[in-house]
């Protein structure tokens, strides 16, 4: 079993960080969210001079048994086809990783296809997709623990290379379904308030998806499961891998850059296991997927961008990175009033 020892950042440095930010040559609070981000990263790293080094993006791939119930407009073959596309540098995630200097790691957690011919994809396949949670738990406990461990060890590898900020993405057709269910169960909301169109379902298809997922949730509770059991019961291998990565990153006091609906749902699930993980999360964007805005509000999360994105892969998180970089540069490179020989006027 993988254990995580996560502590909330020590707040003793907070006053000094705020003083440093307020003494920069600007009206207090005039750089808004940049000041908040600089403060958060300073607390995470326990320093008055936070920094970003060797950013890494982990992209976990996996298929879902629930896809067999026609809850997604995209066929499951798209998962493996896109994973191969990523090895060729042709995906949105590739572009933004190149643009912003992220090292990209592709991980097969449970894609329903043999990808061993592609050495750029790290083979951690647990199974050829999860079980169909309409009828059975998506994974057993051994698979759940294994997925957590894989995610954690991948972060350990990044940390050993000097990485202190991690971004996480996913590729898994139908993974909006477990995300919606987690949101419903963990936030105690009706499922119809948490469901979205995924890759583009129409109204009739949405109603079918809702009926399938509601039946699965009803069966889950009828069997006496507790809310925390929803993580392995409904989750995908790629999603649990992401949770393990988030928890280990928090344990190592790394910044966690959270993407859209799927990754926010993973952070929500991670917080059910270790609430302290939330202090390490920066939310890159609010996606166009139904339910994400409400989820972020319930998590007291403030996304940096709202661009109508719903691609996944971690693309929205990666697009927000320059803002985070600007916040760190602000606290380190901007003159204070004394150095700039400017009268402090507040």
What positions do the PLM features span?
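N-terminal loops that bind phosphate or other acidic moieties
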Residues: 1-346
């Amino acid at each position: 079993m993988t254990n995580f020892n996560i502590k909330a950042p020590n707040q003793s440095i907070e006053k000094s960080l705020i003083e440093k930010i307020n003494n920069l040559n600007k009206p207090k609070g005039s750089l808004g969210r940049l000041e908040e981000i600089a403060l958060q990263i300073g607390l995470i790293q326990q320093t008055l001079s936070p920094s970003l080094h060797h950013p890494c993006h982990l992209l976990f791939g996996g298929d879902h048994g629930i896809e067999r119930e026609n809850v997604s407009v995209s066929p499951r073959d798209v998962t493996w086809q896109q994973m191969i596309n990523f090895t060729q540098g042709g995906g949105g995630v590739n572009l933004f990783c190149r643009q912003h200097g992220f090292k990209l790691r592709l991980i097969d957690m449970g894609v329903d296809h043999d990808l061993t011919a592609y050495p750029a994809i790290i083979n951690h396949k647990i199974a050829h997709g999860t079980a169909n949670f309409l009828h059975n738990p998506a994974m057993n406990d051994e698979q759940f623990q294994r997925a957590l461990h894989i995610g954690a060890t991948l972060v350990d590898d990044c940390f050993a290379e000097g990485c202190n900020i991690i971004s996480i993405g996913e590729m898994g057709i139908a993974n909006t379904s477990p995300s919606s269910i987690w949101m419903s169960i963990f936030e105690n909301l009706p499922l119809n308030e948490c469901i979205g169109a995924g890759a583009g379902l129409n109204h009739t298809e949405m109603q079918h998806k809702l009926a399938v997922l509601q039946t699965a949730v009803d069966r889950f509770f009828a069997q006496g499961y507790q809310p925390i059991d929803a993580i392995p019961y409904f989750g995908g291998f790629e999603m649990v891998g992401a949770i393990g990565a988030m928890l280990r990153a928090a344990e190592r006091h790394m910044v966690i850059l959270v993407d859209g609906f799927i990754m926010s749902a993973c952070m929500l699930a991670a917080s059910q296991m270790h609430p302290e993980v939330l202090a390490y999360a920066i939310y890159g964007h609010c996606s166009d997927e139904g339910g994400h805005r409400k989820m972020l509000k319930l998590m007291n999360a403030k996304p940096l961008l709202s661009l109508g994105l719903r691609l996944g892969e971690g693309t929205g998180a990666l697009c927000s990175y320059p803002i985070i970089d600007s916040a760190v540069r602000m606290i380190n490179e901007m003159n204070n009033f004394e150095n700039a020989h400017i009268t402090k006027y507040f």
